[in-house]
């Protein structure tokens, strides 16, 4: 790792200094490394370049206007230019942020024009061992105030950047995003489910908590998110399972935490949802 980590930060963080890490054609990828304590909150912000958030250790949650994403060490989140986002640390994390130069009118890790649409949305990606190693080799400082790079260091950084972009283009998307509504009533219910998804297993239980009828809540899910409560909650459970697995929680304990009667019932849900075994999906 090219930079020593600073002391652990906690609580709300802001104002930010993204200009210190601004990428450009000469240095197309800039890296920032921070150690953030549990419950640290980074204020909503945006910047005119793309971002790849990689949790080297720990688990973070990134929230945008219409969704939230869980990022454990085996995954990363791509954030397109101009998208406002906030960060909440779920367990103490070494957060490596890559800022990527995006030429005018382009979006993505130097992909063909026909592939750019997929990169204009936030997406969770698998992080290969090679991508992680390359990203950690980039020159990273906690405050962007490192000394100027030598000519040899700049050439090496250029080669590393090319390899990072190549690995990023090959990274597979993972369904760990959870859509969030604009309606305040439904948003409050969704935040409650995200905070404690195993509290209730039925729509009736959650509707009772928020003082609305199940029919009203079901209608709001359809009109606001275009999905059913059951389908939406399933995405929450998948995201929470990944976060728990990153803390090395056993499969049986994860199943119980999420309200499943048995590990086999939880495994069946994962296979049905993502077409992969729990161990493969959870990165364990």
How does the language model describe each region?
Residues 82-110:
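Ligand-binding loop in jelly-roll beta-barrel domains
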Residues 1-60:
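Generic protein-terminus/edge-of-domain signal
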Residues 200, 204, 223-263, 283-284:
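Terminal helix-turn-helix DNA-binding modules in bacterial transcription factors
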Residues 66-81:
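Short acidic-glycine-tyrosine-enriched beta hairpin
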Residues 208, 219, 223, 256-257, ...:
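Alpha-helical residues within the helix-turn-helix
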Residues 120-121, 145-210, 223-235:
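Short, Lys/Arg-enriched, Trp-marked, Pro/Gly-tolerant hinge/linker segments that flank
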Residues 1-14, 246-247, 268-284:
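…primarily DNA-binding HTH/wHTH and HhH modules…
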Residues 74, 217, 221, 265-266, ...:
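Short hydrophobic/aromatic patch on the recognition helix
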